[in-house]
Curated annotation (Swiss-Prot):
Signal peptide: 1-22
Disulfide bonds: C38-C52, C43-C78, C50-C74, C53-C64
Tissue expression profile of the protein: Expressed in leaves.
Keyword annotations of the record: Disulfide bond, Signal
Protein name: EMBRYO SURROUNDING FACTOR 1-like protein 1
Family according to the record: Belongs to the MEG family.
Keyword DNA repair in record: no
Organism: Arabidopsis thaliana
Cell membrane among keywords: no
């Protein structure tokens, strides 16, 4: 490989790493504190990984959500 190819490859790898870090954080910086109203917990024996409203935990078990967007949806609903 020529040195220009190596330099170009390094730039691409660094760009992909930066993009991965940005997507993993949801576009938010570490310094910003996110107000989360939900906590992880089991909502049913068949669905072990759910997000439940912390202030309604044990009172209303139906206030839990699962799935890939469960955390975001839970935070939206619990902050109402």
């Amino acid at each position: 490989m020529k040195s220009s190819h190596i330099a170009l490859l390094c730039i691409v790898v660094l760009s992909l790493f930066a993009l991965h870090e940005c997507c993993e954080q949801g576009g938010q910086r570490h310094s910003q504190k996110v107000n989360e109203a939900c906590v992880p917990g089991p909502c049913h024996p068949l669905v072990p990984h759910c997000w439940c409203c912390e202030h309604l935990r044990g009172i209303r078990p139906q206030c839990c959500w699962s799935g890939s967007t469960g955390r975001d949806y839970c935070n939206q609903q619990c902050n109402l």
